[in-house]
Amino acid sequence: MEKIVGIVVAAGKSKRFGEDKLLINIKGMPIVYYSIRKLHDIKDIEKIILVVRNEMLEYYKEKIKDWKLEKVYKLVLGGEERQDSVYNALKSVDFHCDYVLIHDAARPFVSIKKIEELIKFCTENSLSAILGIPVKDTIKVVDNTTKRIMETLDRSKLWIIQTPQMFPFEIIKEAHKKAREENFVGTDDASLVERLGIPVYVIEGEPFNIKITTKDDLLWMEGILSKSELV
């Protein structure tokens, strides 16, 4: 059986939000709890590494016990950028691991069904894959100075990318190591693998698997929760 480690990235500074968005309560528990719990409840994920800010280390040590999240076996300090945080987690893996599944702590609404679908695809095909949804709106390239439209992109080939993202362990570790050596900063983990010429595939995700980034996202979240059972 393949050994899978989950990495939950909770080391962001929430600059755009104005407060620690991960601690905002949803039905009595903070956002971060649900993001970890989704991975925790999947039997194929053996262990979880939680990446946190230094000033939150003691808080999470206590809460992981309170929340009975036994699969969280290690807390790792984050870096300056998200990419640094993930690399710190990858370096901390101290046992044989076949795959790594990386998830943003600010995405509490991903379904267990979709995570399991992602795991099945990767392990059965020995491939890397990520969740994403097709773009529905028209996307244009705009000159930020003049605001002139430069190009209209073919949306039939465009996808909005989400997490979790899953990779064979040695591939994602090498991709992060290479990016660090070459001072390359990608917008997600998959972009680091892509630049090595290694294929990454997309599994269609769900529109409600949004990343809570601004107060507007919170309003959207509250509206959805009033009508559903996403957590």
Swiss-Prot record:
Signal peptide: none annotated. It catalyses: 2-C-methyl-D-erythritol 4-phosphate + CTP + H(+) = 4-CDP-2-C-methyl-D-erythritol + diphosphate. The record marks 16, 21 as: Transition state stabilizer. SUPFAM superfamilies: Nucleotide-diphospho-sugar transferases. PROSITE patterns: ISPD. The record marks 155, 211 as: Positions MEP for the nucleophilic attack. Pathway: Isoprenoid biosynthesis; isopentenyl diphosphate biosynthesis via DXP pathway; isopentenyl diphosphate from 1-deoxy-D-xylulose 5-phosphate: step 2/6. GO terms for molecular function: 2-C-methyl-D-erythritol 4-phosphate cytidylyltransferase activity. It comes from the Bacteria. Pfam families: IspD (PF01128). CDD domains: CDP-ME_synthetase. Keywords: Isoprene biosynthesis, Nucleotidyltransferase, Transferase. Its EC number is 2.7.7.60. GO terms for biological process: isopentenyl diphosphate biosynthetic process, methylerythritol 4-phosphate pathway. NCBIfam families: ispD. HAMAP family: IspD (MF_00108). Belongs to the IspD/TarI cytidylyltransferase family. IspD subfamily. Catalyzes the formation of 4-diphosphocytidyl-2-C-methyl-D-erythritol from CTP and 2-C-methyl-D-erythritol 4-phosphate (MEP). This is 2-C-methyl-D-erythritol 4-phosphate cytidylyltransferase. It comes from Dictyoglomus thermophilum (strain ATCC 35947 / DSM 3960 / H-6-12). The gene is ispD.
